[in-house]
């Protein structure tokens, strides 16, 4: 069995009319495109069965072709009974028919005669001047256009109206309809009106959304999927377990409430009884900052997406943001039993449209047809990558690992003009909140405190291992949340260790996400021999009166320079910290008067990199003297760097004492006096870091080596000449601490 090729104009014959279909479940979009192309252009769709292929076929005369398709759609679908003499043509099978019909022979010639058959040729009525007809135009009669695509499906008038709106505006559609209605005989006008309203069937059921109306079950599953997807963006913190469980339980148990809330207008308040919603919202505010909702006790006025929470004590007002629109719905489902309307039926104000809004929305829909973008395949592909990037920028779960490592990275390495610098994290000031367990005993705990002001520190703890301090602030309900302030230094593992230790002496149930309030870093310039350059002769610095440092301020950030070329930087970390240091050190290291010893810079930067700690006073002095002695004796200074690379001068941060012990502890050895500021020598106390922890050989040589009166001036003279500072021979054994007259050799004086 084979189908008759088409589209083909059938000769006038008896036919049966069919009712227009607005819902065709078996009709595919490709078949509707093929039918429309045949109605408009009298030819098959040569290209792909897509909108782009249809555009190519309609390109010569889109308005004329679209109007011809409208006229044929208004005449409707028809069925012509036929018989094929050879019995090989395929047709639609229907009821038995006896009467005049079409007889088709083996050569495809049509004749009319009496037939008895149940086969029909599907066609569409046509009243066109362009039809291939032997009669003059004034003697036109209704013809039929046979379409092979109608053998497997029917015409879906909703789909046809969507395709028509692609090529015509609505006023053009109306003009085409009325012009065609004026030339038709009165006998065809009822059919025309019936098919006209079938085309406009989609305008009877208006919707705010772009998506077509879904079935109730599909809409309920769609809401559940959106709720689950939205909750998945919150992260998986233990404090949100009860909130997730309450939402999931109520969504499955109370689907009617879910439907009511989804249909509720954004300008209508949701009334809730009880304070559970306030507790859930406080926890979510702490954990997901992008979803923060302000909880107010004063009425904020008429605002969209408002929730009114009534408690025995007072009334709370929560105004949810419009994006995402499902936010208020999800939070209200957590307390679905406490919502102040009936759970059995729809809410009285849960309808989308009022009676007076239908004409306005219909006019807006017709106006939107005029300016709507065409649904071409290229335009239908959204840029999902850009959407994901915008979402990822605000989602706490997608915080990049590189950002976390920058925040908790203990060291940063910078190379500027082949000068190596290591930046150390001194400490971080971290703010967060904790929720505590309810005490089960009558003993005094952290929770048994009187009512105080909110900014009052009620407890302060200092931990030795791992080293950090914590301050606990007052809170009205410490079981729900209290603020803590942590001062700590170290990497991510050190921080997690500290948080675990914190749970050993505080009744902590959950720790909320932390935020770094301040960040302090420090660095030493190793190898810069004239260290006074960082604090003298500069116009962009100012001295502080209450601290012995000079502050350089650039781009709103301060760099404090202490003696011996040591600097501290606050409020910045990661790559911005590196850029700030580059801008700060570039004028110093590139100055023509700067004297830099590359060997010392490589040795000390290597030790800092190996030991992950700043070089202490005794280490610094010992290695400075060792380097100068090797240089004075014409020995290879590079051997010291090779020895440092093999670990000969390594030290550990753990051997540094954490307390300022008395001077008696200092005589026990290096292990005890490394960071102790004073030692007991020659019946007096002497500060080790009086000249600065990073003081170089030129700075501290005047205060040491008193027993080598003959050798010391020679080594000092050699060091000054090596640096090109034009040493004047004024230093003798008797007055070796007297500063030179030449201002260019001020570096031999101790820097204060």
From Swiss-Prot:
Q: Which Pfam families match?
A: Herpes_UL87
- Disulphide bond pairs: none
Q: Which InterPro entries match?
A: Herpes_UL87_C
Task: Spell out the subunit comment.
Answer: Interacts with ORF34.
Entry similarity comment? Belongs to the herpesviridae UL87 family.
Q: What job does the chain carry out?
A: Plays a role in the expression of late viral mRNAs together with ORF34.
Task: Provide the protein name.
Answer: Protein ORF24
Give the species. Human herpesvirus 8 type P (isolate GK18) (HHV-8)
């Amino acid at each position: 069995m084979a189908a008759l090729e088409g589209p083909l104009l059938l000769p006038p014959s008896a036919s049966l009319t069919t009712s227009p279909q607005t819902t065709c479940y078996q009709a595919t979009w490709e078949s509707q495109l093929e039918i429309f192309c045949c109605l408009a252009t009298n030819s098959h769709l040569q290209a792909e069965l897509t909108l782009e292929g249809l555009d190519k076929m309609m390109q010569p005369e889109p308005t004329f072709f679209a109007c011809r398709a409208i006229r044929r759609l208004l005449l409707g679908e028809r069925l012509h009974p036929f018989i094929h003499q050879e019995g090989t043509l395929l047709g639609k099978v229907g009821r038995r028919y006896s009467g005049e019909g079409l007889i088709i022979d083996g050569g495809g010639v049509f004749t009319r005669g009496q037939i008895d058959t149940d086969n029909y040729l599907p066609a569409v009525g046509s009243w066109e001047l362009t039809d291939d007809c032997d009669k003059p135009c004034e003697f036109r009669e209704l013809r039929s256009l046979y379409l092979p695509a109608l053998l497997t499906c029917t015409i879906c008038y909703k789909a046809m109206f969507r395709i028509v709106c692609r090529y015509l505006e609505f006023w053009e559609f109306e003009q085409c309809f009325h012009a065609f209605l004026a030339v038709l005989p009165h006998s065809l006008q009822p059919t025309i009106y019936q098919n006209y309203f079938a085309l406009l069937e989609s305008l009877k059921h208006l919707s705010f959304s772009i998506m077509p109306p879904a079935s109730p079950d599909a809409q309920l599953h769609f809401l559940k999927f959106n709720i689950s997807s939205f909750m998945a963006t919150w992260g998986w913190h233990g404090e949100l377990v009860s909130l997730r469980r309450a939402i999931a339980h109520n969504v499955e148990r109370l689907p009617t409430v879910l439907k009511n809330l989804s249909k509720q207008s954004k300008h209508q308040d949701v009334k809730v009884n009880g304070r559970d919603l306030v507790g859930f919202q406080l926890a979510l505010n702490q954990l997901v900052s992008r979803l923060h909702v302000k909880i107010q006790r004063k009425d904020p006025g008429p605002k969209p997406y408002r929730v009114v929470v009534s408690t025995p004590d007072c009334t709370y007002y929560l105004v949810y943001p419009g994006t995402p629109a499902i936010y208020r719905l999800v939070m209200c489902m957590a307390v679905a039993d406490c919502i102040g309307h009936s759970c059995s039926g729809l809410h009285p104000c849960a309808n989308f449209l009022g009676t007076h809004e239908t004409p306005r929305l219909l006019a807006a829909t017709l106006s939107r047809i005029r300016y709507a973008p065409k649904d071409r395949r290229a335009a239908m592909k959204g840029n999902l990558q850009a959407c994901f990037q915008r979402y990822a920028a605000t989602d706490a779960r997608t915080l990049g690992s590189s950002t976390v490592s920058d925040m908790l990275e203990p060291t940063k390495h910078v190379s500027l003009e082949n000068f190596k610098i290591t930046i150390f994290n001194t400490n971080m000031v971290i703010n967060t909140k904790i929720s505590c367990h309810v005490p089960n005993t009558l003993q005094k705990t952290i929770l048994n405190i009187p009512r105080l002001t909110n900014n009052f520190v009620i407890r302060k703890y200092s931990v030795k291992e791992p080293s950090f301090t914590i301050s606990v602030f007052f809170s009205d309900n410490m079981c729900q949340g209290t603020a803590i302030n942590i001062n700590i230094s170290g990497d991510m593992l050190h921080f997690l260790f500290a948080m675990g230790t914190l749970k050993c002496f505080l009744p902590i149930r959950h720790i909320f996400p932390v935020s770094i309030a301040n960040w302090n870093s420090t660095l030493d310039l190793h190898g810069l021999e004239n260290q006074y350059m960082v604090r003298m002769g500069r116009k962009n610095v100012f001295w502080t009166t209450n601290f012995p440092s000079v502050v350089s301020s650039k781009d709103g950030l301060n760099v404090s320079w202490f003696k011996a070329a040591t600097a501290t930087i606050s409020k910045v970390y990661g790559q911005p910290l590196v850029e700030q240091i580059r801008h700060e050190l570039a004028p110093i290291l590139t100055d023509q008067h700067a004297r830099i010893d590359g060997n010392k810079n490589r040795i000390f930067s290597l030790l800092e990199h190996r030991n992950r700690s700043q070089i202490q006073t005794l280490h610094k002095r010992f290695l400075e003297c060792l380097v100068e002695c090797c240089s004075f004796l014409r020995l290879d200074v590079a051997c010291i760097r090779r020895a440092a690379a093999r670990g000969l001068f390594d030290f550990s941060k753990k051997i540094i004492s954490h307390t300022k012990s008395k001077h008696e502890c200092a005589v026990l050895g290096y292990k005890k006096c490394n960071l102790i500021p004073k030692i007991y020598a020659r019946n007096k106390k002497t500060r080790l870091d009086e000249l600065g922890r990073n003081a170089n050989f030129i700075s501290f040589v005047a205060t040491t080596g008193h027993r080598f009166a003959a050798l010391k001036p020679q080594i000092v003279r050699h060091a000054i000449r090596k640096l090109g500072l034009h040493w004047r021979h004024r230093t003798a054994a008797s007055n070796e601490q007297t500063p030179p007259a030449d201002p260019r050799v001020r570096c031999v004086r101790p820097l204060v």
